[in-house]
């Protein structure tokens, strides 16, 4: 597939997601990184977003709950270039009914080449990077070329 470049803005669009068993850990991480996070545009699946907003006072655009389609809503935003970073504290030891949606969200994040943090360690590395506060060029699929090949 041909590639093109997309410029991520200095103020990133960050999606925050957590499975139920991981919500307390994400909340703790968000509280620890509130100062950094408030400089960016925040999105989340429904339950996670409402909990984080209530507990931290951060402005978060909440989708619907993950199992009800929120993961897919975030995936659509990623494919439209409207999400720059995904922080997804998922529980690898417990299956959830919407596992196919979870896999699809992680797959689409990889397709569109956005950074993904799946635990505290990767989130720390990502949010301690100076690139978080800078414009960054990333390679993404050239959808126009992809479409032209198929027409």
Swiss-Prot record:
Molecular function in Gene Ontology: methylglyoxal synthase activity
PROSITE patterns linked to this entry: METHYLGLYOXAL_SYNTH (PS01335), MGS (PS51855)
Active site (record annotation): 71
Residues annotated to bind substrate: 19, 23, 45-48, 65-66, 98
SMART domains linked to this entry: MGS
Domain of life: Bacteria
Domain MGS-like: 6-151
Entry-linked Gene3D superfamilies: Methylglyoxal synthase-like domain (3.40.50.1380)
UniProt xrefs under SUPFAM superfamilies: Methylglyoxal synthase-like
Task performed by this protein: Catalyzes the formation of methylglyoxal from dihydroxyacetone phosphate.
PANTHER family tied to this protein: METHYLGLYOXAL SYNTHASE
Family to which the UniProt record says this protein belongs: Belongs to the methylglyoxal synthase family.
The protein, known as: Methylglyoxal synthase
Organism field: Vibrio parahaemolyticus serotype O3:K6 (strain RIMD 2210633)
């Amino acid at each position: 597939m041909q590639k093109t470049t997309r410029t991520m803005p200095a103020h990133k669009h960050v999606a925050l997601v957590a499975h139920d068993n991981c919500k307390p850990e994400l909340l703790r991480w968000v509280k620890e990184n509130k100062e950094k996070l408030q400089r960016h545009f925040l999105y989340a699946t429904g339950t996670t977003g409402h909990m984080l907003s209530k507990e931290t006072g951060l402005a978060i655009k909440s989708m619907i709950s993950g199992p009800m389609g929120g993961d897919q809503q975030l995936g659509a935003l990623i494919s439209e270039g409207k999400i720059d970073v995904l922080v997804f504290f998922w529980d690898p030891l417990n299956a959830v009914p919407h596992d196919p949606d979870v896999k699809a969200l992680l797959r689409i994040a990889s397709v569109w080449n956005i950074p993904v943090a799946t635990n505290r360690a990767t989130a720390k590395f990502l949010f301690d990077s100076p690139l978080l506060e800078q414009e960054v060029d990333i390679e993404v699929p050239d959808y126009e070329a992809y479409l032209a090949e198929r027409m």
